[in-house]
Structures are given as structure tokens and as C-alpha cells.
């Protein structure tokens, strides 16, 4: 292990909801399911550009980060670009979902139930330890743990953008968002103030 550095970062996870139910047992349907999920994951990744970077793929999710300090970009640019991308993830996801629905290859369970898939995105701002293991760049630390814990929450809908107060204050969105303030609590991490945006409630 070498090249250990701590950076202030925006941490983001884009996670496909309905993935477990979608990956059904029939062999043909499993293959079609994986193809569909892969297409949707690739769609999200195609939206990623510097200052956002992909840390890793985590099954049905993409773990992203943006360093808050940069020799190339101003902080104002980073926070605005991140806000634009957080919204664009939903637009791109649903455009791809519509395309797959329109051109679905068959009537199997996977192809017939595309409407059950949705996207949830969680975001937190904090610190992360960057280190290398062989050729792999890893991130760790309390804030990395927290952003993953946020995927398990009390929100009663499948599609949303959940931000901690730190992320909400750091990110600047292109339009006014209707958000709901909430509270989550996690063992060893304590209470977390959150702001939740549901895509259909966008103002502007």
C-alpha cells in the first residue's frame, strides 16, 4: 500500500433500484437482465466527466467522487458541474430506459418489466483517504462508509436524490429543487441531516 493521501471530496453513489427483483432465475431472462443493467450502468458512466471520476462499479451501482481542490478547476465550477450531473443522471437514465422499452428484444420477464427499474442517488461531502493496492485506487474513511450507509434509509420511494447537509450546501444546481429535509441515524455514525429531491418535483 502506498501513495496515501487524504482529500476533501464530494462522494456520490448512483444505484439502480429494483435490481435484485429484476435479476430473475430463468437463464434467458438473467442474460437479458444483465444486458439491460449493463446498458443503464454505461449510460450513467457516460455522463461522468472531470471533475467527477468513477471510483468503482459496485454491482448495480456506480461509486463516484470529485475532489474539492483542483489545480485545473475552480471550486465554483466543481460545485456547479456536480449539481448539473446529479440531475442529468436521472434524465439520461430515463431516456435510456425509454429507448430499451421501445426497442425491447422479446417478451421475457426482464424485457417486460423495465418499468420496475428506477434510480436513486446519494451524495455526501467530507474526506476520504486515497490509496493504491496494486493497480487499484481505493477510497476509505468514515465519510466513505456514511455515503454507502445512506443507501439504507427511511425514504418511501424508489427514485430520489438524497444529500447530506454537507453535500446540499456544497453542490449548486442549475434550477431550484424542491427538497424535503429529513433525518437518518446510523450505528457509530449518529444522526445525519438529509435533503431529499424527487425528480418529478423539480421546479424551474
What are these regions (language model features)?
Residues 1-84, 88:
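Catalytic NTP-binding/metal-coordinating core of nucleotidyl cyclase/transferase enzymes
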Residues 4-6, 57, 114-116, 139, ...:
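A generic fold-level signal
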Residues 26-29, 151, 193, 202-204:
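Residue-level detector of solvent-exposed, low-hydrophobicity positions
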Residues 69-181:
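Catalytic beta-strand-to-alpha-helix segment of the class III nucleotidyl cyclase homology domain
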Residues 169-204:
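C-terminal tail/extension regions appended to the core domain(s) of diverse proteins
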